[in-house]
């Protein structure tokens, strides 16, 4: 029977490639890495990734999810497609749901060796992409200005969000994506419910081994401000409630 094994994230919330490599056996057929990672936003270094790919047995496919690649500010960040010729067992996946803003069309793609592409082509649905989605994607690929504006907006929003979180006393995980995860000091699901009551949606990420963290997407300046304002309000209410319940109060 086919089985999957989830690996714990290492210190500072990134992927432990050495642990992943050590976990590979003769029965392993596929390894999955998101770079930048979701939901923490961390990324592995180019050297770490190259060394990992070189060490993975050739019978193991390595799926490198680069959904958030365009948000990475480091110009020298490794583009997985650039090393496909060197590592034929590498499969790079991308999406138009993030930087291009086309989540509704559900359009993604992979770049791989002809061997894997042939296998994937045999298994795919006959009408897996519609013509409207393809037209939208072709238009998006020609709109470089929109992508550049999205990157600039995300950069400014990330500064606004992280400075706001720091000002409120929350520790966040430095992110290379379009979101940031932070330690809310309580079960993330509890904060999720309180934020929801205020009309703000965040994502609890306990299922990723981070029970006290939530992830919030970077939005427009007014949206970021709205989130930070609600978070401050919830924190103030919690502090007041705690003081009222303190012994001798």
Model-derived regions: residue spans:
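Short beta-strands and strand-loop turn motifs
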Residues: 6, 30-36, 62-66, 173-175
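Conserved PLP-binding catalytic core of the aspartate aminotransferase-like
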Residues: 154-155, 163-198, 214
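Short acidic/glycine-enriched loop/turn segments that link adjacent beta-strands
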Residues: 104, 176, 209-212
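Active-site pre-lysine segment of PLP-dependent enzymes
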Residues: 14-26, 39-62, 66-99
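Short, small-residue-biased leader/transition segments that mark boundaries at the very start
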Residues: 2-9
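PLP-dependent enzyme catalytic core of the Aspartate aminotransferase-like
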Residues: 47, 194-198, 203, 207-249
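PLP-dependent aminotransferase class I/II
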Residues: 89-173
